[in-house]
Amino acid sequence: SIDEALLLGHRIVVIENGLVKAQYQVPETAGERNLLDDWFISLKRDIINNLNITE
């Protein structure tokens, strides 16, 4: 899931037809990541748009 990738990953890659469509760097943060933070919400929306799916 996108949320799991945001919580656990440091880099998220969107692949379409075997090609890299988009890459995202998730900064290493001290403490826990907050998916309700504006930065994470914006990143999730961008990933969803690149996947051509609706929220």
Where are these regions (language model features)?
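A short, surface-exposed alpha-helical micro-motif characterized by mixed small hydrophobic
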Residues: A5-L7
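Conserved beta-strand-loop-alpha-helix hinge in the C-terminal portion
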Residues: V14-I48
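Short secondary-structure subsegments characteristic of cysteine-rich extracellular domains
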Residues: N49, I53-E55
